[in-house]
From Swiss-Prot:
The keyword Repeat applies. Has a two-domain beta-structure, folded into four very similar Greek key motifs. The lineage of its organism: Eukaryota, Metazoa, Chordata, Craniata, Vertebrata. SMART domains: XTALbg (SM00247). This is Gamma-crystallin C. Belongs to the beta/gamma-crystallin family. One of its GO terms (cellular component) is cytoplasm. The modification S-methylcysteine is found at C23.
């Protein structure tokens, strides 16, 4: 089970809201979010209600201001607890509809370019576990939560283009 607390002000000040479950709409509980404490679990935060907009992966720890989770603003409007699994495995494809060169991963990959000599991934198949795809190397830039399923084109995971820099398994490290 996970537990996360949102605070309206920096350094864990101001009005707060605590949850242990997915929340499709956080707007009734706070108007802005400037700090977060994750007591347990891994959470994906979204800048808009109903799991839309920019995504931010947070693991157990303290985030005294929104820059600590690479936030672009103090807007957090929905969140979901990411289920934990023991094993992780996914397949990357250079073309849409799972065509072209296929590569398989079971560990974090800080640079897709260095490892596979690709800067774009056109389709994916997540076989086990949840992953986060980052648009830039070293786990930077826009983030996309990938659950076990087939993604036939980049729009299926919410991206506007196929730019892919790094991949990380969602694992609660504690």
């Amino acid at each position: 089970m996970g537990k996360i607390t949102f605070y309206e002000d920096r350094a864990f000040q101001g009005r707060s809201y605590e949850t242990t479950t997915d929340c499709p709409n956080l707007q009734p509980y706070f108007s802005r979010c400037n700090s977060i404490r994750v007591e347990s679990g891994c959470w994906m935060l979204y800048e808009r209600p109903n799991y839309q907009g920019q995504q931010y992966l947070l693991r157990r720890g303290e985030y005294p201001d929104y820059q600590q989770w690479m936030g672009l603003s103090d807007s957090i409007r929905s969140c979901c607890l990411i289920p934990q699994t023991v094993s992780h495995r996914l397949r990357l494809y250079e073309r849409e509809d799972h065509k072209g060169l296929m590569m398989e991963l079971s560990e974090d990959c800080p640079s897709i370019q260095d490892r596979f000599h690709l800067s774009e991934i056109r389709s994916l198949h997540v076989l086990e576990g949840c992953w986060v795809l980052y648009e830039l190397p070293n786990y930077r830039g826009r983030q996309y939560l990938l659950r076990p399923q087939e993604y036939r084109r980049c729009q299926d995971w919410g991206a506007m283009d196929a730019k892919a820099g790094s991949l990380r398994r969602v694992v609660d490290l504690y």
